[in-house]
Amino acid sequence: MGVLSPTRTMRLWGPRSLGVALGVFMTIGFALQLLGGPFQRRLPGLQLRHSWASSLGPAAPSCPPRQHLVFLKTHKSGSSSVLSLLHRYGDRHGLRFALPARYQFGYPRLFQASRVKGYRPQSGGTQPPFHILCHHMRFNLKEVLQVMPSDSFFFSIVRDPAALARSAFSYYKSTSSAFRKAPSLAAFLANPRAFYRPGARGDHYARNLLWFDFGLPFPPELRTKRGNPHVSRDPNPPQLPSGAGPPAHTLDPNALFHPVPIVADGHSQMSSPASLDLGSSSFIQWNLAWLDSVFDLVLVAEYFDESLVLLADALCWGLDDVVGFMHNAQAGGGQDRSTIDDGGLTTEERQLTARARAWNNLDWALYVHFNRSLWARIKQYGQSRLDSAVAELRARREALAKHCLVGGEALDPKYITDRRFRPFQFGSGKVLGYVLRSGLSLQDQEECERLATPELQYKDKLDAKQFPPTVSLPLKTSRRPSP
């Protein structure tokens, strides 16, 4: 993988090392989050010959596009839509994916390099490098760096734990023993310990799922019966400091965090009706600082389009590279910002939201932290500039949907007869998908298919492209002719 850069070397540190210089470490990590190149607006790569094409002419790129990418695909956070962007970008540019043998890298176990299809550690440097690692895994930095170049761009996505809990309860009700025993999400959150048993089958879906996906250790009172899996798998992970541990809820569960920036004295700030004292827990603080040193950008599902604009900026990609359709969305389960703003919630909904955040207190800490990071980055990018780019992105997406899709939107799976575009149906909710319009040109048909293909089918397509089946000739056709 070559010599590690100073930044990537720092990524190998665990919070135990951070105890020596926590303040400096957090400052550096936060600074890394704020770095980014100028955003490039370019003409659409898909020539649909419609009015959605930008009137701005193509801009000459001022930086090379980043193509070594590590995306931690978190569960029920809009990550399938990001995965679709990566699939399409890598497919168009002939990039090499680090693919699992099936569809996940041994989840829920920690990621291991040996699970990457075609990975040969003893190849002596002759193996072509991987460009993109993006399928479901439980993050394990040391093993990831065995597979990916040290200059890779690391990013992920988080979602408000209250919204995530609603989606996870519906999707994983048959998988999680805790959810399966509960008659409703409200009943579960009213008394979660009556249903939840640490270490029970699938119960990592029922509490602090984001924290789990990031591969972070759990404080003693939250550890599973199997113990903290970091201990035996990774010698340099975050570790719980001796004599330290977070209180039961480090964040006020009644504080409905409102992430919209408020200008005060010329500075953008975050508003909250209650103080969110993350500093009260060194355990949480150290883990968040470690994540800051590892991840170059963390997207926020409730601000998905804003996040995509920042992603394009950070990667030096064109706007069209991040224009796409939503994938793996459940019927009636859209990305609604009302969950993070108490203004539109009923009393019952507020109570459910507060309980979900309190139960998933580590996820709530993650969400608050990376939400603030996102808005700090937006301030640096420029609010008016961002608003313009988001409006353009949405206009292009809408034009693509009208041009490519029957009805111009996602449809109930009962209308999807083409198996290439029918999303995998799991859980109690219906997963929506797409039907392509007829009469598309060959070029437009190809691009619209890329946009509409669900993640499992696209992974299979990439697998077949990267590992084409070998055809052996029958023995009789390979015989030499008689003299």
UniProtKB/Swiss-Prot annotation:
Keywords: Glycoprotein, Golgi apparatus, Membrane, Signal-anchor, Transferase, Transmembrane, Transmembrane helix
Residues on Cytoplasmic side: 1-18
Top EC class, one word: transferase
MF GO annotations: galactose 3-O-sulfotransferase activity; galactosylceramide sulfotransferase activity
Pfam family, one: Gal-3-0_sulfotr
A single BP term in Gene Ontology: glycolipid biosynthetic process
Ranges of the Lumenal topological domain: 40-483
Pathway entry: Protein modification; carbohydrate sulfation
Subcellular location: Golgi apparatus, Golgi stack membrane
Needed cofactors: Mn(2+)
Glycosylation-annotated residues: 371
Segments of this protein annotated with the region Disordered: 225-248
Gene3D superfamilies documented for this protein: P-loop containing nucleotide triphosphate hydrolases
EC number: 2.8.2.-
Entry keyword Chloroplast: no
Membrane topology according to the record: Single-pass type II membrane protein
PANTHER family assigned to the protein according to its UniProt record, in alphabetical order: GALACTOSE-3-O-SULFOTRANSFERASE (PTHR14647), GALACTOSE-3-O-SULFOTRANSFERASE 4 (PTHR14647:SF57)
Its biological purpose: Catalyzes the transfer of sulfate to beta-1,3-linked galactose residues in O-linked glycoproteins. Good substrates include asialofetuin, Gal-beta-1,3-GalNAc and Gal-beta-1,3 (GlcNAc-beta-1,6)GalNAc.
Family: Belongs to the galactose-3-O-sulfotransferase family.
Record's protein name: Galactose-3-O-sulfotransferase 4
Species, as recorded: Bos taurus
